[in-house]
């Protein structure tokens, strides 16, 4: 998306109060059910003494760690910094790519789906809104979100539906 499109999108959202409130609500609140479902699944596995609890906790943690290291190294400016507009939602500067919200929500979706396809689909739908909201708030470029998602799709596919599926 071109710079002027980010500015227009940002101005449109900020000039429509209900849309702005909805975008902020999604950005602030939709990660919560993803985390709740994930932790509930881990607790369920732990209570059942299911050894899958370890990989279902470790793989998202490893993904989070790798994405954090990569974004620290890249240290890409956020759209509001490089283009020069006030975002819908204020955020710290730098470390925009890859999006950790996008990456985390996608890898959690893989972990949840690995245990329960039903809850995995629900988590996936919620994660879509989490990812989309990061662009709408002006804190990520589309490419930041796609990069975060791609990393987690690769790691999730390779582990949950590759290595672990063969065991």
What do the PLM-derived regions correspond to, one by one?
Residues 1-36, 67-94:
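N-terminal transmembrane-helix/juxtamembrane module of multi-pass inner/ER membrane proteins
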Residues 58-71, 121-133:
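Small-polar-interrupted transmembrane alpha-helices in polytopic inner-membrane proteins
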Residues 47-48, 72-80, 138-143, 164-165:
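Transmembrane helix-loop junctions in multipass membrane proteins, especially transporters and channels
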Residues 40-66, 119:
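Interfacial segments of alpha-helical transmembrane regions
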Residues 64-68, 72, 153-160:
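Transmembrane alpha-helical segments of multi-pass membrane transport proteins and ion-pumping complexes
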Residues 17-19, 33, 49-52, 116-122, ...:
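Membrane-helix interface segments
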Residues 84-167:
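Membrane-embedded catalytic cores of phosphoryl/pyrophosphoryl-handling enzymes
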């Amino acid at each position: 998306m071109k710079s002027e499109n980010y500015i227009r999108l940002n101005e449109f959202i900020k000039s429509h109060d209900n849309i702005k409130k909805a975008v902020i609500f999604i950005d602030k609140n939709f990660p919560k059910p993803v985390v709740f479902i994930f932790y509930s699944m881990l607790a369920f596995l732990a209570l059942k003494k299911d050894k899958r609890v370890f990989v279902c906790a470790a793989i998202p943690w490893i993904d989070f760690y790798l994405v954090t290291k990569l974004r620290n190294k890249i240290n890409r400016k956020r759209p509001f910094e490089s283009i020069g507009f006030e975002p819908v939602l204020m955020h710290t500067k730098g470390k925009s790519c890859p999006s950790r919200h996008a990456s985390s929500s996608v890898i959690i979706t893989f972990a949840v789906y690995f245990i329960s396809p039903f809850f995995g689909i629900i988590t996936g739908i919620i994660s879509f809104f989490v990812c989309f909201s990061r662009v709408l708030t002006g804190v990520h470029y589309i490419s930041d979100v796609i990069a975060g998602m791609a990393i987690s799709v690769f790691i999730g596919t390779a582990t949950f539906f590759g290595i672990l599926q063969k065991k």
